[in-house]
Regions:
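Universal eukaryotic N-terminal targeting presequences
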Residues: 1-2
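Nucleotide and nucleotide-moiety/phosphate-recognizing core
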Residues: 5-131, 138, 142-146, 150, ...
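Acyl/amide activation-and-transfer machinery of modular secondary-metabolite enzymes
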Residues: 165-174
């Protein structure tokens, strides 16, 4: 169903429509909803609300993967990887990427949390740049066979201590109301600004 739906978006013979695929990665929800590690999913939902102003396009469940997808337009596909752990993102997402028609005409942008950026900051990095130790991005690279995807890094800040357990507890903690408000305003506006050249 996923491939067929995407296929219907492709125009007729002689012209290949370019597709932008925004993929948000995170841990299973609702268990980890609104945690810092799921900032990529939070931002994907905010982007969908803004880009689909009429609210007429909702997520559909993938039949063969723990993920959801949404066609905001014939040129823009959103994939929400929310059914398996973020460190296994490649296992979930890449089979869906491989089912897209005209793969060479697809621009992939992965939306993810970023410890090295403070909350409210967003960075768009080109394919081939550092993965900065993000295990979800590493998994995508491993399963895709390359790092040929853009990364939209959503800042979540970093705890003062660098102890691995402290960092783990931090990324699995939930955003409070004020932090969610920052994501929905400052972070969202910066994300839209960064994505202008690709959407």
């Amino acid at each position: 169903m996923f491939a067929a739906r995407v296929g219907r978006s492709a125009p007729s013979i002689g012209f290949v429509r370019r597709l932008t695929c925004l993929t948000g990665i995170g841990n299973p929800e609702p268990q980890y909803a609104n945690t810092r590690h799921n900032a990529g999913l939070v931002m994907l939902d905010l982007l969908r609300q803004r880009l689909d102003s009429g609210g007429s396009h909702s997520y559909k469940v993938c039949m063969n993967a723990p993920a959801k997808y949404c066609h905001v337009s014939p040129d823009l596909l959103l994939i929400r990887s929310d059914g398996d752990y973020i460190n296994l993102s490649g296992k979930t997402v890449v089979p869906l990427w491989k089912r897209l028609p005209h793969r060479d005409a697809v621009t992939h942008i992965v939306v993810h949390d970023e410890l090295s950026l403070p909350l409210g900051k967003v960075q768009l990095r080109k394919p081939g740049t550092s993965l900065r130790g993000h295990n979800g991005l590493r998994s995508l690279r491993s399963h895709w066979g390359s790092d040929g995807f853009h990364r939209l890094a959503i800042g979540i800040g970093r705890p003062h201590e660098r102890d691995p357990q402290v960092v783990s507890d931090y990324v699995l903690s939930r955003f409070d109301g004020q932090e969610m408000s920052i994501l929905a305003t400052q972070s969202l506006e910066k994300a839209l600004e960064k994505l202008q050249s690709l959407l």
